[in-house]
C-alpha cells in the first residue's frame, strides 16, 4: 500500500497528533535506537570474560524450537546464534512439523550436519503438525536441562543472551526470566521496533502477553 494512503488512513482513524507522534517514534526507533541496540556481536574481551565466568551451578538450559516450513536463511541464522552463545551449557531441541517435504528434507539435512559438529543439537521429525503449542511440547519432551528456553524458528539470540539469563539465575535465583526484544525487517540490520518489557505486573499481563520470547523458566 502507498505510504501516503497508509498515513491518511491512520490520521482518519487516530487523528493527526497521534499519527505524528507515531511517525516520530518509529523514526527514532529505526534510525537511532536501532543502530544503538542492533549489533549482534560482542568484543573479544567481553567474550573471553563471559566464557570464563563460573556460576555457582552450571545449569543446562534446553532451548526448544518448533520448526514449521522454516526458511533456510532464518534457520541458519537461528542455529548460528545459538551456537555462538558465550554460555556453553545448553542444548537445542528442534521439533520439525513441516508439511513441505522439500523444506523438511532441507531442515533435517542442516540439523544433522550441525549435530555431527555439535552434540548439543537434537532434531526430531514430527509426523503430525499439532500447532505451535503442542509442537513446542514435543520439543520440551526432548529436553534434558534444568531450565527451558522458548525460541521461535525465525528468532536470533544475542551472543550474551544465555550468559545474561544465567546471571539472573545465579545472583537473583530467577525462576522465570523474560527479555527485551528487537523486531527485524527480514535482516538484522533493519530494525522495525524495539520492545522494552516492563517489570512483571499481573494487571498488564492480563491484557498484553509481553513475556513471549526470549523466555526461560
Predicted segments, located by residue:
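A recurrent flexible, glycine/aromatic-enriched loop bordering the glycosyltransferase active site
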Residues: 133, 141, 190-217
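Short aromatic/hydrophobic "clamp" motif used to bind/position activated sugar donors
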Residues: 148
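Acidic donor-binding segment of Leloir-type glycosyltransferases
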Residues: 83-128
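Short alpha-helix within the catalytic core of nucleotide-sugar-dependent glycosyltransferases
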Residues: 79-80, 137, 145, 158-171
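N-proximal low-complexity "stem/linker" segments adjacent to membrane-targeting elements
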Residues: 9-81
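The conserved acidic donor/metal-binding loop of glycosyltransferases
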Residues: 152-156, 180
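Conserved donor NDP-sugar-binding/catalytic core segment of glycosyltransferases
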Residues: 160-191
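Glycine-rich, basic loop-to-helix element that forms the pyrophosphate-binding segment
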Residues: 126-143
Amino acid at each position: 500500500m502507498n505510504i501516503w494512503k497508509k498515513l491518511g488512513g491512520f490520521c482518519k482513524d487516530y487523528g493527526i497528533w497521534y499519527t505524528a507522534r507515531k511517525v516520530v517514534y518509529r523514526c527514532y526507533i529505526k534510525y537511532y535506537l536501532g543502530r544503538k541496540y542492533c549489533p549482534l556481536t560482542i568484543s573479544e574481551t567481553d567474550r573471553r570474560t563471559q566464557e570464563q565466568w563460573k556460576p555457582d551451578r552450571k545449569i543446562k538450559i534446553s532451548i526448544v524450537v518448533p520448526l514449521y516450513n522454516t526458511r533456510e536463511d532464518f534457520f541458519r541464522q537461528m542455529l548460528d546464534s545459538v551456537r555462538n552463545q558465550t554460555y556453553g551449557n545448553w542444548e537445542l531441541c528442534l521439533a520439525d512439523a513441516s508439511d513441505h517435504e522439500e523444506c523438511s528434507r532441507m531442515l533435517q539435512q542442516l540439523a544433522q550436519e550441525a549435530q555431527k559438529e555439535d552434540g548439543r543439537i537434537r532434531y526430531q521429525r514430527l509426523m503430525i503438525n499439532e500447532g505451535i503449542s503442542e509442537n513446542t511440547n514435543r520439543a520440551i519432551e526432548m529436553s534434558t536441562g534444568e531450565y527451558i528456553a522458548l525460541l521461535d524458528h525465525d528468532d536470533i539470540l544475542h551472543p550474551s543472551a544465555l550468559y545474561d539469563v544465567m546471571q539472573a539465575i545465579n545472583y537473583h535465583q530467577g525462576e522465570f526470566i523474560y527479555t527485551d526484544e528487537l523486531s527485524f525487517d527480514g535482516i538484522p540490520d533493519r530494525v522495525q521496533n524495539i520492545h522494552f518489557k516492563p517489570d512483571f505486573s499481573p494487571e498488564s499481563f492480563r491484557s498484553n502477553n509481553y513475556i513471549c520470547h526470549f523466555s526461560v523458566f
